[in-house]
């Protein structure tokens, strides 16, 4: 097992191997414990690629919840789950944190199969409230007695699923606690009317900063708690006036706050009184993303998931690599300068999708809808109906949430919407919840959607140009990772649906596009009889070239960074069958099972789509493959 960098004196944390050990500490010891937890999290995250700022901001509420509740009997749910590092440490996984998100190590999110203390498996936003409601309903139906508490960020609360669940929670009236962790951030800055309402609540200053502020907050809460319990609706000590302007109250959910989310002793005091109230209650806490680490507090967007850094100084080496996200961002920003119809829509992924510069250069043609993928797609449909050329910039794993909108709102009317799909394929350390290995399959099933897989930044630009100048919905998918930068003004002319022969050889031909093409070229580089085709379009296929290679080669190998179920390989087999061509075909792709976290290269090897795996298949097909020493 790996060791954490640096050393630290953690006398309190050393005593804790589970929640029961935490309860043995006095309340007066809790602030010191939270400082030790923050130091531990900083050391864990200093290796890079982990969720630092959000985890630091949630330390106090996680500590308070475990101090008051009885996990795993009581169920504590975390929305998204990336902020739950303190939860993992306090529930007996401290010695596994050095290997978090590594192959064979623990997940970076909560995961039911990992620990009895992880109430849900999660990675996507806005799911916790519906899960919590289901648990509360099941508890009551089974005649059991335990608490259900869900921790959700203000960013996740912008998601329609969370708001819809909140509406049902208020209607059902079951006992449960919702902790609204308000740090004004998701990954990018939060947007939308709900975010503005949350800021309005903070402005009212129902808690004060400075010495003695916590006591004042507690005193302010006492009367409203009594009012809530007696259902007096017109108390002069209500937190808001009138109550009807508060959407939580309007939904039938008791609201308390906002309170200081970094005073662990006062959070304990509050939780002890709130968890036993009948009906649903929201505790609104205000936190600072990156709390306790000055450089993370100053730049929470970068420190959300930083590269490797020195925990003492915050110094890090900026990456000089050119990412696919940057390639897309530069291309669409440049293209929009020449076409006033181009309008970019994204669901809370400005930084991740490479759109910071676009949002600055074209602020009136940029829309961040928050964590609301369905809204992003249908808003783009509305734009297209009015003659715009919207581009939806979205991660593959999140496009899954808007399948119906792509089908119903875009494809049926063959609208001019371009989907630029980042993080397509295996993403690596974030694991099963974030791998983008289904988009080829579900988009293939929608009539009229054309799908491209660029091999590099130049092809991405060519596909974007084609999509923005031709009618109908287009999908351009590209992986997480890096590509070669191309000069501004590079706009190659591509014909959609036309493949490219990259290596001669007619005995066995490998068909691959995107990331998989790199593996195919490497596998075949020293094999003269093995051809390689850049199958950069999955829909439509290049039937002319497929007929040619399918008629000559004795075997074809399709390779894709997508599930084998309904993917590129299936499309090739369907086409060959319709042509009455029957060469041997081997379909390589992601197996029909969820892939756990590891590096993308490791998962590709495990799935059998990397260069050595392709060479093994070539040998099985009778190709003379030199033995590698």
Curated annotation (Swiss-Prot):
Annotated binding of thiamine diphosphate, by residue: 82, 123-125, 155-156, 183, 373
MF terms (GO), sorted A to Z: 1-deoxy-D-xylulose-5-phosphate synthase activity; magnesium ion binding; thiamine pyrophosphate binding
InterPro entries, per the entry: Dxylulose-5-P_synthase, THDP-binding, Transketo_C/PFOR_II, Transketolase-like_Pyr-bd, Transketolase_BS, Transketolase_C
Co-factor note (free text): Binds 1 Mg(2+) ion per subunit.
Keywords: Isoprene biosynthesis, Magnesium, Metal-binding, Thiamine biosynthesis, Thiamine pyrophosphate, Transferase
EC number: 2.2.1.7
Cited PANTHER family: 1-D-DEOXYXYLULOSE 5-PHOSPHATE SYNTHASE-RELATED, 1-DEOXY-D-XYLULOSE-5-PHOSPHATE SYNTHASE, CHLOROPLASTIC
Organism: Deinococcus radiodurans (strain ATCC 13939 / DSM 20539 / JCM 16871 / CCUG 27074 / LMG 4051 / NBRC 15346 / NCIMB 9279 / VKM B-1422 / R1)
Pathway entry: Metabolic intermediate biosynthesis; 1-deoxy-D-xylulose 5-phosphate biosynthesis; 1-deoxy-D-xylulose 5-phosphate from D-glyceraldehyde 3-phosphate and pyruvate: step 1/1
Binding site for Mg(2+): 154, 183
Family: Belongs to the transketolase family. DXPS subfamily.
Gene3D superfamilies: 3.40.50.920, 3.40.50.970
Reported cofactor(s): Mg(2+); thiamine diphosphate
HAMAP family named in the record: DXP_synth (MF_00315)
Subunit structure: Homodimer.
GO-annotated cellular components: cytosol
Role description: Catalyzes the acyloin condensation reaction between C atoms 2 and 3 of pyruvate and glyceraldehyde 3-phosphate to yield 1-deoxy-D-xylulose-5-phosphate (DXP).
Superkingdom per UniProt: Bacteria
Name of the protein in its database record: 1-deoxy-D-xylulose-5-phosphate synthase
GO biological processes: 1-deoxy-D-xylulose 5-phosphate biosynthetic process; isopentenyl diphosphate biosynthetic process, methylerythritol 4-phosphate pathway; terpenoid biosynthetic process; thiamine biosynthetic process
Catalytic activity, reaction form: D-glyceraldehyde 3-phosphate + pyruvate + H(+) = 1-deoxy-D-xylulose 5-phosphate + CO2
Enzyme class: transferase
């Amino acid at each position: 097992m790996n060791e954490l960098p640096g050393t630290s004196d953690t006398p309190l944390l050393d005593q804790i191997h589970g929640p029961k050990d935490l309860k043995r500490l006095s309340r007066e010891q809790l602030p010191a414990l939270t400082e030790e937890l923050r130091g531990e999290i900083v050391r864990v995250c200093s290796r890079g690629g982990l969720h630092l700022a959000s985890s630091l901001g949630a330390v106090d509420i996680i500590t308070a919840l475990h101090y008051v509740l009885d996990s795993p009997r009581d169920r504590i749910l975390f929305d998204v789950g990336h902020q739950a590092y303190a939860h993992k440490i306090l529930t007996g996984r401290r010695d596994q944190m050095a290997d978090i998100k590594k192959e064979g190590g623990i997940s970076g999110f909560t995961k039911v199969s990992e620990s009895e203390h992880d109430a849900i498996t999660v990675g996507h936003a806005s799911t916790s409230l519906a899960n919590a409601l289901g648990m509360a309903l099941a508890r009551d139906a089974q005649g059991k007695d335990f608490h259900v508490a869900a921790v959700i960020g203000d960013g996740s609360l912008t998601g329609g699923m969370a708001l819809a669940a909140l509406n049902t929670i208020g209607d059902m009236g079951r006992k449960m606690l919702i902790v609204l962790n308000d740090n004004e951030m998701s990954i990018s800055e939060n947007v939308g009317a709900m975010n503005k309402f949350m800021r309005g609540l903070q402005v009212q200053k129902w808690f004060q900063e400075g010495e003695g502020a916590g006591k004042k907050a507690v005193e302010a809460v006492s009367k409203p708690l009594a009012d809530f319990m007696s259902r007096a609706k017109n108390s002069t000590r209500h937190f808001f006036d009138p109550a009807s302007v508060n959407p939580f109250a309007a939904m039938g959910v008791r609201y308390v706050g906002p309170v200081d989310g970094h005073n662990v002793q006062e959070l304990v005091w509050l939780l002890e009184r709130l968890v036993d109230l009948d009906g649903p209650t929201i505790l609104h806490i205000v936190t600072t993303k990156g709390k306790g680490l000055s450089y993370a507090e100053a730049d929470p967007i970068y420190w959300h998931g930083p590269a490797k850094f020195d925990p003492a100084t915050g110094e890090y080496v900026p990456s000089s690599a050119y990412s696919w996200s940057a390639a897309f961002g530069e291309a669409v920003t440049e293209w929009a300068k020449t076409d006033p119809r181009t309008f970019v829509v994204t669901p809370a992924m400005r930084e991740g999708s490479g759109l910071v510069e676009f949002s600055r250069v074209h602020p009136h043609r940029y829309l961040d809808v928050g964590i609301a993928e369905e809204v992003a797609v249908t808003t783009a449909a509305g734009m297209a109906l009015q003659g715009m050329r919207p581009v939806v910039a979205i991660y593959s794993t999140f496009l899954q949430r808007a399948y119906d909108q792509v089908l119903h709102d875009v494809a049926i009317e063959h609208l001019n919407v371009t989907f630029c799909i980042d993080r397509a394929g295996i993403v690596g350390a974030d694991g099963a919840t974030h791998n983008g290995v289904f988009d080829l399959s579900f988009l293939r099933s929608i009539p009229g959607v054309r799908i491209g897989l660029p091999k590099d930044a130049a092809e991405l630009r060519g596909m974007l140009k084609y999509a923005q100048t031709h009618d109908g919905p287009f999908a351009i998918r590209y992986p997480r990772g890096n590509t070669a930068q191309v000069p501004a003004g590079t706009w190659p002319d591509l014909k959609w649906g036309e493949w490219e022969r990259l290596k001669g050889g007619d005995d066995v031909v490998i068909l691959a596009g995107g990331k998989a093409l790199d593996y195919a070229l490497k596998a075949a580089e020293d094999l003269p009889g093995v051809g390689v085709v850049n199958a950069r379009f999955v829909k439509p296929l290049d039937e002319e070239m497929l007929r040619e290679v399918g008629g000559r080669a004795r075997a074809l190998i399709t390779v894709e960074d997508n599930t084998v179920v309904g993917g590129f390989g299936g499309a090739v087999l369907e086409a060959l069958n319709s042509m009455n061509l029957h060469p041997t075909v081997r379909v390589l792709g992601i197996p029909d099972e969820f892939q756990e976290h590891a590096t993308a290269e490791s998962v590709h090897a495990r799935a059998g789509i990397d260069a050595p795996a392709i060479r093994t298949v070539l040998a099985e097909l009778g190709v003379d493959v030199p033995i590698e020493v």
